[in-house]
Amino acid sequence: MPRVKGGTVTRARRKKTIKLAKGYFGAKHTLYKVAKQQVMKSGQYAFRDRRQRKRDFRKLWITRINAAARQHDMSYSRLMNGLKKADININRKMLSEVAISDEKAFAELVSKAKEALK
């Protein structure tokens, strides 16, 4: 039986890796061995940072809510506690958007939270 080297399959696989490495600097986008390593590392970064992004956005929303709450003489933790006691269910993403875009509505939420804390 003749030897089968699988040239087209190997070429296609390598071509796919090089295509994934498009935009990388230096040898990382031209040489297969280096490109393969970088594509694998990039995949690890992407996996990790998809989770990190969720944490980063939550931190951003909390920072924005805290800044807006302090303009109304209230801390973030007291505001969230007051909203929970007032039975106002609004998530941090929406609350930060309200704090940025609609100052009157946010002031109303703060006043309801203050009433619930009394």
Swiss-Prot record:
Question: What InterPro entries would the database entry show?
Answer: Ribosomal_bL20, RIBOSOMAL_L20_CS, Ribosomal_protein_bL20_C
Stored PROSITE patterns: RIBOSOMAL_L20
Record keyword Electron transport present: no
Q: Does the keyword Transit peptide apply?
A: no
**MF terms in GO:** rRNA binding; structural constituent of ribosome
**Record keywords, A-Z:** Ribonucleoprotein, Ribosomal protein, RNA-binding, rRNA-binding
Q: Which GO terms describe its biological process?
A: ribosomal large subunit assembly; translation
Gene Ontology CC terms = ribonucleoprotein complex; ribosome
Task: Mention any Pfam family matching this sequence.
Answer: Ribosomal_L20
Q: Matching NCBIfam families, A to Z?
A: rplT_bact
Q: Which family does it belong to?
A: Belongs to the bacterial ribosomal protein bL20 family.
Entry function: Binds directly to 23S ribosomal RNA and is necessary for the in vitro assembly process of the 50S ribosomal subunit. It is not involved in the protein synthesizing functions of that subunit.
Give the protein name, as stated in the record: Large ribosomal subunit protein bL20
Source organism per UniProt = Staphylococcus haemolyticus (strain JCSC1435)
Q: What is the lineage of its organism?
A: Bacteria, Bacillati, Bacillota, Bacilli, Bacillales
